[in-house]
Amino acid sequence: MPDIKTLNNNLRKTLIGGRVVLTQGINVKMPKDIARILAKVRNFNNFTKANDPYGEHDFGSFDYNGEKIYWKIDYYDKSYQHLSENPANPNITNRVL
């Protein structure tokens, strides 16, 4: 079974394997800006002990046009009603970026 970091990287890099939800603040941007922001999320590799203490690659932030952008991956059960009991198990976990 893949580990949490691998599953998170797959979602983040391909935007496949979970849901991608954009905040209102991102959704109101021009399509080219949204595409650039998503590209920065996909290519993010500045993981440190400070922003990734568990080595799961589930959070990051970067500057875009003078604005701080944050992204996060959360783990839900298959109904999206509760947190997943085991984020390492894709059979019982849905990821949301």
For the regions a language model picked out, list residue spans one by one.
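Compact soluble domain cores
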Residues: 2-60
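Short, compact, well-ordered microdomains
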Residues: 58-97
